[in-house]
A protein has these predicted regions:
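Solvent-exposed interaction patches of small proteins and small membrane subunits
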Residues: 1-156
Length: 156
């Protein structure tokens, strides 16, 4: 069963933290690395936001995606949500690599490729803002379906 409160809380925390990154939206990750405190703050916020996204994905897959094989890699969780029609496949392919970025942050920042280093912080903010909208739309639709089913069950 979906835990709407848990998912919405994680999305709200991420939104709050992403808003704090807006002063850096025109910087690339490479530029943020030029200042230790900026780099540390940006990395930590992005790591937390991406981790919450992966947690949300796994929760949704566990609740409604029982017909899918369990994702072995974090990036697969984003692709599975496209299979469950939460968002378009193109969006899944765009956001899925962020799981690898999160792993690079956690394990070894030096392994980031040039394209990732040149990613604008604003692009990541937009991607996860869009992600939150897709998830919230899904939750609204799913809750409506749950309420309809409950009403039908009561009327027999």
């Amino acid at each position: 069963m979906l835990d709407y409160t848990l998912i919405k809380r994680k999305l709200a925390l991420s939104e709050e933290e992403l808003q704090k990154l807006t002063p850096y939206r025109n910087m690339t990750l490479e530029q943020a690395a030029g200042d230790f405190l900026t780099q540390a703050a940006v990395e930590r916020v992005l790591e937390k936001v991406i981790t919450r996204g992966i947690d949300i994905n796994r929760h949704i897959i566990g609740a409604i995606g029982t017909h899918l094989r369990a994702p072995r890699k974090n990036r697969e969780t984003f692709l599975h949500l496209a299979e469950l029609a939460l968002y378009p496949r193109e969006f899944a392919e765009k956001i899925a690599p962020s799981a690898g970025f999160r792993n690079a942050l956690v394990h070894d920042y030096n392994n980031l490729d040039e394209a990732t280093r040149n990613t604008k912080i604003g692009d990541v903010i937009k991607m996860y803002t869009d992600y939150a909208k897709y998830i919230l739309d899904f939750l609204d639709q799913h809750r409506a379906a749950d309420l309809l089913k409950a009403a039908q069950d009561r009327t027999g």
